[in-house]
Amino acid sequence: MLSQCLSRTSRAVAGSNGHRFSKLSAIDGVHHAHPSPRRYTTFSSSDHADRTKRLLDAKEKAGLTYDKLASKLGITNTYAAQILLGQTKLSAATAAKLQAALPISEQDIEDMKSTYPMRGFDDEILKEPNVYRTYEAITHYGEAIKSIINEQCGDGIMSAIDFYCDVGTTTGVNGEKRVVITFNGKFLPHIEQKEEDNTAKSPRD
């Protein structure tokens, strides 16, 4: 009976967040599911993780901060971090600069240039306090931000595709270090769906 219950629980959890679970273990009498790497037809999270570790080790070996690496690559510091974390595709032009800046294998460079990344995130990351507080700030101020965007730009959204993000610091009035995050996204207005502009009308039986 217990094994059947655990089996049902494991399937339910796996279905809720996209993970597959390889086994269940008991800690203090409570059974915990251990996620196995996600697998996609063109993407392996274990390969991704191995490459990311090599890239971060190379960054540390080179003694570069993200700001210094970004300066060498001519990109924002968050985009430099995304490249190393496998959250964006590496362009040919930036690949040459990256290889000059860090001791990276030719195979890793080619894989980063040819792989279309899975840009989603594991829900587990929201348990990290730094990440969650950023998420909390955006959700807390979300309605106010939307209202101001609408007031200043009209009915639409800020793109996260035609988009720049930069992280920096400043000094507060009491001498404390403060974090500054800048989002610079293209405004995309919602369109009025006029029939004459619809080039792909659905068929009618």
From Swiss-Prot:
Q: What's the domain of life for this entry?
A: Eukaryota
On whether Chaperone is a keyword of this UniProt record, the answer is no
**CDD domains in the cross-refs:** HTH_XRE
What InterPro entries does this protein map onto?
Cro/C1-type_HTH, Cyanase, Cyanate_lyase_C, Cyanate_lyase_C_sf, Lambda_DNA-bd_dom_sf
| SUPFAM superfamilies reported for this sequence | Cyanase C-terminal domain, lambda repressor-like DNA-binding domains
Any one of the GO BP annotations: cyanate metabolic process
* UniProt keyword terms in alphabetical order: Lyase
Any one Gene Ontology molecular-function term assigned to this protein's record: DNA binding
Could you tell me the EC number(s) of this protein?
A: 4.2.1.104
- A Pfam family of the record is HTH_3
Query: Which reaction equation describes what this protein catalyses?
Result: cyanate + hydrogencarbonate + 3 H(+) = NH4(+) + 2 CO2
Q: Does the keyword Lyase apply?
A: yes
Which residues catalyse the reaction? Answer: R133, E136, S159
Transmembrane segments annotated in the record for this chain:
none
Role according to the record: Catalyzes the reaction of cyanate with bicarbonate to produce ammonia and carbon dioxide.
Similarity comment? Belongs to the cyanase family.
User: Which PANTHER family does this one have?
Assistant: CYANATE HYDRATASE
Q: What is the protein's given name?
A: Cyanate hydratase
Which organism does this record belong to? Answer: Thalassiosira pseudonana
